[in-house]
């Protein structure tokens, strides 16, 4: 019987070719992309290539693509920037915005 998964808020099934590429990159480019040594620079190059590919698909600049470590970090980042850079005075939200 085929599974139907409807809880994609925090997780989602991964296509096999995506999983294969992720494993390949994690095994070969394991450096910290924030480091200045050669392994870190190599990892950073992979991240920047991904950023450019995503930007091309979204028809935007690579500088507009921001990677965060979680939905919580992303939500906090956008809310803080809405207040500090765009003068947003009031934010209305609910408990269901991030479960």
Predicted regions span which residues?
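Pyridoxal 5′-phosphate
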Residues: 1-99
